[in-house]
Amino acid sequence: MVPMTIKVAVAGASGYAGGEILRLLLGHPAYASGELEIGALTAASTVGSTVAELMPHLPQLADRVIEDTTKEVLAGHDVVFLGLPHGFSAEIANQLGPEVTVIDCAADFRLTNADDWSKFYGSEHAGSWPYGIPEMPGHREQLKGATRVAVPGCFPTGATLALLPAVQADLIEPDISVVSITGVSGAGKKASVPLLGSETMGSLKAYNTSGKHRHTPELTQNLKEVTDKDVTISFTPVLAPLPRGILTTATAPLIDGVTQEQARKVYEDFYVDEPFVLVLPEGVQPQTQNVVGSNMCHVQIEVDTVARKVLVTSAIDNLTKGTGGAAVQCMNLALGFEETAGLPRTGVAP
């Protein structure tokens, strides 16, 4: 039974994901009505600092002080968002009772295969929770009423939404190349020489190439849910001098006989009832600036008749649909709110 006032805590509140969750919660109709209350804000390195010092774009919370992330501080909350580094969520989640809805933005509970987890994260697998892409077949129902939710990674979100209809409808051979250009906020706030302005401004750089990126098994897992074929993915992330946004371009061999008209109809039919996925008109390409600050994913599907390939492009805001917005969308489903509550569909272009 949902309490009359839902008390929400955000662990990792001073990070980019935590800050985005707070921004969206402050605009949630349940917060405006008093049905939802923002409780403890916790972190590690910023304990004792105020929101005004760390996140002046959230003036409603200006006087709130960041606390330590402990079981005692998080006790008494109905919902706990975890925006912690990978590997820390399981420890905290295990200290919270089953009556608490825990929504984890880290990778700890995304992968179902323990070997994949060990290979890419180098620690013991903590298990898997309902996975937070409601647009995937069957996942919306799994998320309704869930008390444990794994928020997807930002790269798998953009790439999964780009490829899911093509793989499910057998438009392509699932030997797929994915290139995702991302803003630097995806790496978090921790100081790092490769993320300095002088290193990133005016420059593009691929990283964790040739199957090394941790999001590769997550994307593969997602696409395997909708096909019996073997799925092979070559994933290349590219760091761009942008604060936020991911532009994904995916290509794969076309199944003989598939036309542009057929491919486009598959995408339009697949996403016709999805509030946060927009298949753009023919000839209009997704741009990151058009989705910044929104929970939208813009998609374009094209058939390259010369190369005999399908080309799918998607754009998301890595902090909204890629993290914080996805977390709030999952909260809405878990608690029985309108799925779209508090989640903007309009971007802030240019």
Curated annotation (Swiss-Prot):
What are the GO cellular component annotations? Answer: cytoplasm
Q: Per its UniProt record, what Gene3D superfamilies does this chain match?
A: Dihydrodipicolinate Reductase, domain 2, NAD(P)-binding Rossmann-like Domain
What is one Gene Ontology biological process annotated in the Swiss-Prot or TrEMBL record?
L-arginine biosynthetic process
Q: Which SMART domains match?
A: Semialdhyde_dh
CDD domains linked to this entry: AGPR_1_actinobacAGPR_like (cd24148), AGPR_1_C (cd23934)
The UniProt record lists the EC number as 1.2.1.38
Named in its record, the pathway it takes part in is: Amino-acid biosynthesis; L-arginine biosynthesis; N(2)-acetyl-L-ornithine from L-glutamate: step 3/4
- Major location category of this protein: cytoplasm
Determine if Disulfide bond is one of this entry's keywords. Answer: no
Could you tell me the superkingdom of the organism this chain comes from?
A: Bacteria
Q: Which UniProt keywords apply?
A: Amino-acid biosynthesis, Arginine biosynthesis, Cytoplasm, NADP, Oxidoreductase
**Record has Cytoplasm as a keyword:** yes
Write out the catalysed reaction: N-acetyl-L-glutamate 5-semialdehyde + phosphate + NADP(+) = N-acetyl-L-glutamyl 5-phosphate + NADPH + H(+)
Alphabetical list of Pfam families matching this protein: Semialdhyde_dh, Semialdhyde_dhC_1
Question: Example GO molecular function term?
Answer: NAD binding
What SUPFAM superfamilies does the record tag this protein with? Glyceraldehyde-3-phosphate dehydrogenase-like, C-terminal domain (SSF55347), NAD(P)-binding Rossmann-fold domains (SSF51735)
- Which residues does UniProt mark as catalytic? C154
User: Tell me, what does this protein do in biology?
Assistant: Catalyzes the NADPH-dependent reduction of N-acetyl-5-glutamyl phosphate to yield N-acetyl-L-glutamate 5-semialdehyde.
- Which family, according to the similarity comment? Belongs to the NAGSA dehydrogenase family. Type 1 subfamily.
* NCBIfam families, A to Z: argC (TIGR01850)
Protein name, UniProt field:
N-acetyl-gamma-glutamyl-phosphate reductase
Q: Which organism is it from?
A: Corynebacterium efficiens (strain DSM 44549 / YS-314 / AJ 12310 / JCM 11189 / NBRC 100395)
Q: What is the lineage of its organism?
A: Bacteria, Bacillati, Actinomycetota, Actinomycetes, Mycobacteriales
UniProt gene name: argC
